[in-house]
A protein has these predicted regions:
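ATPase/helicase motor core of nucleic-acid motors
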Residues: 20-29, 34-38, 43-44, 234-349, ...
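Accessory C-terminal helicase-associated subdomains
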Residues: 150-152, 334-448, 632, 637-710, ...
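Conserved helicase core region in the C-terminal RecA-like lobe
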Residues: 5-9, 18-19, 26-35, 153-159, ...
Length: 878
């Protein structure tokens, strides 16, 4: 039985079969874990293995017990600040010391070691035998049981004397029972450049050598950055390469996919894929106030316990309303909850905010999420393409299991969110996940130089850059601690010389294991940052006289490229032409706002309302300014609107409501419409809104009193013909005539002053017309109430210091003009003609304005049509 062994072997290794069949019979490639597992099987030993997160949690439990018994110690302050993170660091120290055969002796050497020794008493009761213990037991049992190893041949890349002492003892024990230990053969020497450099490195000779510039056995390919390297290497066939070495193969796989070539298999390192955040996002729902971004992110997970149709509708409702705890969302949940009450109760936040978090609720959530993740992973595992998702779902289940153990250490009925967040920041950390699975016919790729088992004819080593040194064993120890442990033989540390030689041998394995050609790929920058030179490159630059002869700067040639005609638009044409315009479906109604967009900016209307192409994501929450406006509208409606069967609200009634109910109305509106303002980063904005809104409502009430106005409605929906509008506030003056107020939360006060002065207030004039049609009475006054300035802008007269009247330049009936313009624009779009912001005089609409009685367009100083200040399409329509 051939055992190819190295502590570094894991995942894919490069090994060539001994014969032409391509089959490795009676051969296994193992690292230390694999070797111990195989020997345990033969020795009849079995131990339960815990995954790393579970070990961390158990160690945290042990540390909690120790800290309770010994509250004064050198690590107590760190543990109180971040217990789980401290426990994780302590466990890493403990494991590294155990690998040096420490048996928890030397309490008197340092206070830090004394804490580790004390915690170990509790930890051993929770987890039993650890990995170092298993290695020690197997080593003893090989000799005690006289395991027959006569047919065992152990092949290693380095001599056993260079291994860690604990591993070396295991190899010695196997050798004593008849196992044959061999060092794997290296590439044969020749007179090429590669052999010369190999001898230079092995002999550690000083002085310089000169290489044959016509010999291609050793080449250095330099690229500006990782993108250039991956693009070139994926584009080239390079079919004669036996093995590729690439520590981070993700970008290369992406390029191979773009080139239509088989992917080689890669991982995402130090990352947290979206699906693995299920537990983190779900636990974030327990935070108060509720983070609406977390809720939307939780509902948008690609795989979720709740069905996708419901989640999509709920997200849309949250975005439209500005929050979750409102009537619209409550009604939607109720509609879909039948038969799923428990599911909704567990995986959705409560509609009533609570100041406490019950441990039982958190435990139930974690348990149900774990069960669902395992079931979903099992169901998805039947299809190979779901491999990455299955891996991530099982990671979620493991995190849930670890978190449930943490909850078991918490004895109180309630738990604060800071504790939950602290635990999750440690458990839900970054890890390695599958990016792509190797496809048939792909290149042979290994992720580390040390994983070359067989001699290769041609090797490409990508990433010969950066610091290659390894951290020394137990490097976290203070010199005094290490000296004390070594002097008293409490640890059997790796000899520094042997450790250095071992890492150097393994790091330079491509040099020893390549016979024909070795290509070293160097990237000068990674992620925009300059990289350190690899020790091998430094050595070559110092000792190779003609180093420039073997350095190449490859680029992709221009041959084979398809010529592409350059598209250049020096200026925007007056009109764009749209094919198949007859297929456009118009909405069944327009609003005063969309009418303005259609008439003045038809390109924007086409993109946003007909083609539904917008810059906002479907689940993008409104910004702070918009949220302030929503809250203000909701508070005004709550306090000013008529109640019950009353036809109107009088100023005196409103004054009492404001005095008694403002705080409650504000809190309710904030929860329902302005959840984004409750986030920590927006607290100053929220406090400012509270003060500004109260001031604005006081001014609004004063205006009602001074002008003898009473409120007849808020958020009044009216539909006249094919125009649908929602009027913010309808009022009635002392003569019984209707009045309209439209509320704006904006700092763009100059814009509203201009549209009133120029008689271009489309929204107000349409509201005037619609209310007149509805009530069969003339609406003599309409106005904008501008917040937070608390000013009333109108063309008509109102009494009060905060009321400003603007005299219009003309008294045109703009509603009739707009009606004609709507018909004109619809006809244009139906014929595929889309007006842009071209030269003003070139626009057909401008030419027809007077003749056809159209609503006039504005002209800017550059001689073109004035653009939309709020446009999302400036890239297309300048």
């Amino acid at each position: 039985m051939n055992i190819i062994f190295s502590p570094e072997y894991s995942g894919n290794v490069y090994i060539k079969p001994a014969d032409a069949t391509g089959v490795l019979m009676d051969t296994m490639v193992v690292n230390t874990v694999g070797l111990v597992n195989m020997l345990e099987l033969r020795l009849g030993l079995h131990y339960d293995e815990l995954f790393e997160q579970e070990r961390v949690v158990h160690y945290y439990d042990a540390a909690c017990r120790y800290m309770k018994e010994h509250p004064v110690n050198v690590l107590a302050t760190s543990f109180r600040t971040s217990g789980l993170a401290t426990a994780k660091a302590m466990l890493a120290w403990r494991d590294e010391l155990r690998s040096a055969e420490w048996d928890f002796e030397g309490k008197d050497i340092s206070d830090r070691l004394a804490v580790l020794i004390g915690v170990e008493e509790y930890f051993r009761k929770l987890v039993g035998c650890d990995w170092a213990g298993r290695l020690h037991i197997v080593t003893d049992q090989v000799g005690f049981q006289k395991l027959d190893c006569k047919h065992m041949v152990i092949k290693m890349p380095v001599a056993k004397e260079q291994l860690k002492p604990a591993i070396q003892k295991l190899i010695d024990a196997l050798e004593a029972q008849g196992a044959k230990v061999e060092t794997m053969p290296k590439a044969a020497d020749s007179d090429n450049n590669l052999s010369k450099v190999r001898q230079l490195i092995l002999s550690k000779q000083k002085g310089k050598i000169t290489l044959n510039k016509n010999d291609n056995s050793l080449q250095i390919w330099k690229f500006a950055d990782e993108r250039a390297a991956c693009e070139y290497l994926s584009y080239q066939a390079l079919e004669d390469v036996d093995v590729w070495i690439n520590a981070d193969n993700k970008q290369m796989d992406n390029w191979l996919k773009l080139m239509g070539k088989p992917m080689t298999g890669s991982v995402m390192s130090d990352t947290t894929p979206q699906l693995t955040q299920l537990l983190v996002m779900g636990l974030g729902l327990f935070a108060q106030p509720l983070n609406v971004h977390t809720l939307v992110g939780w509902l948008q997970m690609p795989v979720h316990p709740l069905d996708g149709f419901f989640r999509s509708r709920l997200v849309n409702a949250i975005v439209e309303e500005g929050g979750y705890r409102n009537e619209a969302c409550r009604k939607l949940v109720k509609e879909h909850a039948e038969g799923k009450e428990k599911l909704f109760e567990v995986f959705l936040p409560a509609f009533t905010a609570s100041s406490v978090i019950y441990t039982a609720d958190v435990r139930l959530f974690v348990k149900e999420l774990s069960v669902w993740a395992k079931q979903r992973a099992h169901w998805m595992a039947s299809q190979a393409e779901n491999g990455a998702w299955v891996e991530q779902l099982m990671a979620v289940a493991d995190m849930c299991h670890a978190f449930s153990i943490l909850l078991d250490t918490h004895s109180e009925d309630t738990i604060d969110y800071q504790t939950i967040d602290s635990w999750m920041s440690t458990i839900g950390g970054k890890d390695v996940y599958t990016n792509a699975i190797a496809q048939r016919g792909c290149r042979m790729v290994i992720d580390h130089p040390c994983k070359m088992v067989s001699v290769a004819e041609k090797t490409v080593w990508i990433g010969v850059d950066g610091e290659a040194s390894q951290g020394k064993e137990c490097c976290f120890l203070y010199p005094s601690e290490k000296a004390g442990l070594v002097e008293q033989s409490y640890i059997h540390s790796w000899e520094e010389k042997e450790e250095t030689n071992y890492h150097e041998q393994m790091q330079l394995m491509p040099l020893w294991m390549t016979s024909g050609q070795l290509v070293l790929v160097v990237r000068e920058r990674i992620g925009g940052e300059p990289v350190l030179k690899h020790p091998l490159i430094v050595r070559l630059e110092q000792q190779v006289e003609n180093i420039t002869d073997i350095i190449h700067y490859p680029t992709i040639g221009t041959e084979g490229r398809h010529p592409v005609e350059m598209v250049e638009h020096s200026e925007v044409p007056a009109e764009m032409h749209l094919d198949h315009a007859d297929k456009i479906k118009w909405p069944d109604h327009l609003s005063p706002t969309t009418i303005g967009t259609l008439v003045e900016h038809p390109f924007d209307y086409l993109m946003e309302h007909l083609l539904d192409i917008t810059g906002d994501g479907m689940a993008q929450m409104a910004d702070v300014k918009t949220s302030k406006g929503k809250v203000a509208h909701a508070v005004i409606e709550n306090l000013f609107a008529p109640r019950g069967d009353n036809r109107c609200s009088l100023p005196d009634e409103i004054a009492i409501r404001m005095e008694q109910e403002f705080e409650d109305a504000y809190a309710k509106a904030l929860e329902e419409k302005g959840a984004i303002l409750q986030l920590a980063e927006n607290r100053m904005d929220e406090k400012l809104l509270h003060n500004q809104l109260r001031k604005c409502l006081d001014v609004l009430l004063e205006i009602l009193q001074m002008n003898e106005l009473k409120v007849t409605g808020c958020e009044c929906r009216l539909k006249v013909a094919d125009v649908l509008g929602v009027i913010d506030m309808t009022l009635e003056d002392k003569n019984g005539h209707p009045v309209v107020f439209d509320f704006k939360w904006t700092t763009w006060t100059k814009g509203y002053q201009e549209i009133l002065t120029k008689n271009r207030s489309i929204q107000l004039e349409y509201y005037r017309w619609m209310l007149q049609c509805d009530q069969k009475d003339e609406v003599k006054r309409v106005a904008y109430f501008i917040m937070p300035d608390a000013k009333l802008y109108s063309k008509e007269a109102f009494q009060g210091k905060n009321c400003i009247q603007f005299n219009p330049e003309n008294n045109d009936n703009i509603v009739e003009q707009l009606r004609q313009s709507i018909l004109y624009r619809k006809e244009q779009i139906a014929n595929g003609i889309i007006e842009t912001n071209g030269v003003y005089e070139d626009l057909q609409y401008v030419k027809d304005t007077i003749e056809k009685g159209l609503f006039s367009l504005n002209k800017n100083d550059e001689g073109t049509k004035e653009g939309n200040f709020f446009t999302q399409y400036g890239l297309f329509n300048k």
